Amino acid sequence: AKAAAITFVDLIPEKINLGLVVFDGVARVQVAPTTDRQLMVDAIQRLELGESTAIGEAIFASLDAIASVPPDEEGTIPPARVVLMSDGVTQQGRPNEDAAEEARTRGIPVSTISFGTPFGQIVYEEPGQAPQLVEVPVDQDELRAIADATSGTFFTAESAGELEQVYNDIGSSVGFVTADREITHWFVAGAIALLMLTAALSLAFFSRLP
C-alpha cells in the first residue's frame, strides 16, 4: 500500500503542492503543502501501524487544511477535491456523515476508495505482547455514502495491484486547466491502509497549485 501511495505522489504534476494528513484514532497534518516530492515519499515510508480509525476527523482536517491556503492574487479560491482510501469503518471522532456534510457545504467532492475484502484480517503486534489476529472487513457502504453525499466517485480495490491502478487512474486525471491563468486547485486526500487489508493507520494527501 505504501508503494501505491508513492506511485500516486509521483503521478501528480510537479507544480501542484502536496500535503500529508496521517490519522489513526486522531488526524494530524504530517506534511504541509509542498512541491518537494521526496519529503512526501519519506513521510509515507515512515508510516507505522496504529490503532483505530477516524475517517471523519481526517476529512475535517483536510478541509481545514484547504481553508488555510490563501486565495490567489485576484482573491480567487480555486475548486478542490478529496480522494479518500480506507475500509470505511470509523471508530473514533466525529461521524463520517458530519464530515461529508461539511465537505458538501464547502463544495468539495470526496471520492473514496474501498481497499480490502469483506473477510480481511491482519496480524497486529504491540511491543512486548503476543501478535493478535485482527478482523478488518471493508465497509463499502460508508465509503460509497461519503462519495454520493459529496458528488464524488466511489472506487474499489481488493489488492495492492488494484489499488495502484486506481491511484494511476486518479493521478493521471490531475492537472491544469489552461485559460488566462492556471485555475485548477486539487485537494487530493487518500486514506490508505499502511498494511494491506487494515485501516488502523491511514493517510490523506492534499494539494493546490502555487
Q: Which residues does each predicted region cover?
A:
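…and closely analogous acidic/polar surface helices at protein-protein or active-site interfaces
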Residues: 1-18, 32-37
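Solvent-exposed coil/turn segments that connect beta secondary-structure elements
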Residues: 14, 23-26, 36, 45-49, ...
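Non-transmembrane functional regions of envelope-associated proteins
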Residues: 20-21, 28-48, 60, 67, ...
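Generic structural signal for helix capping and beta-alpha/helix-loop junctions
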Residues: 28-30, 120, 164
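VWA/integrin I-like adhesion module and closely mimicked acidic/polar interface patches used
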Residues: 47-49, 53, 57-60, 72-81, ...
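Juxtamembrane amphipathic/hinge helix adjacent to a transmembrane helix
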Residues: 152-181
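C-terminal signal-anchor/stop-transfer transmembrane helix together with its immediate cytosolic
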Residues: 172-210
